[in-house]
Amino acid sequence: MDKVEVSELHVRIGQVKIGSPGQVLTAILGSCVGIGFFFPQRQIYGLAHCLLSQSSSQPVASSAAQTGRTREDGQLVGNGRHVDKAIESLLKMMDIQDEERRQLRVVLAGGANMSMPFDTPPSQLVGSVNAKFARQAIRSAGLRLLGDDLGGLNGRRISINCDSGEYDIQQIPRLGGTV
């Protein structure tokens, strides 16, 4: 049996990447939220690594930022800094039509509150705000949530296998330090 080589595509903060068979999309998340899109009917998958929940309403200056597409090492990369723009980028980069949205499956990961004191009001916990907004944005976009692993104090690693269409979310335990 021939061994198939799998290419790992790491999605950094603020990026959106699209994967296809033979690739695994991964991200390491703390308070950031990872948004995974699954469209197995076309064997296309996407992952966004979002730093914050919402973008400002200010217009974007560059044409690359407007389309949500730039090139990095030959890989198409979109605008994933904010949850709202990341969802737009994923839909655009995966060429998802309105009538196809119900076929899409979405997973969410991250949104941990890793470095805030325990007495911080919930409205100021970046991870909690990101997680809550991501859930609302997915629902508002008419997308179907397959699963999530959000909140708490631990970071996470999300992987999307573009061969099998399976995903894995692993919690990353905290080592030392105080909260």
Curated annotation (Swiss-Prot):
Keywords: Chemotaxis, Hydrolase, Plasmid. Its EC number is 3.5.1.44. One of its GO terms (molecular function) is protein-glutamine glutaminase activity. The keyword Hydrolase applies. InterPro entries: CheD-like_sf, Chemorcpt_Glu_NH3ase_CheD, Cytotoxic_necrot_fac-like_cat. It is an enzyme of class 3 (hydrolase). It catalyses: L-glutaminyl-[protein] + H2O = L-glutamyl-[protein] + NH4(+). One of its GO terms (biological process) is chemotaxis. SUPFAM superfamilies: CNF1/YfiH-like putative cysteine hydrolases. The keyword Hydrolase applies. Belongs to the CheD family. Probably deamidates glutamine residues to glutamate on methyl-accepting chemotaxis receptors (MCPs), playing an important role in chemotaxis. This is Probable chemoreceptor glutamine deamidase CheD 2.
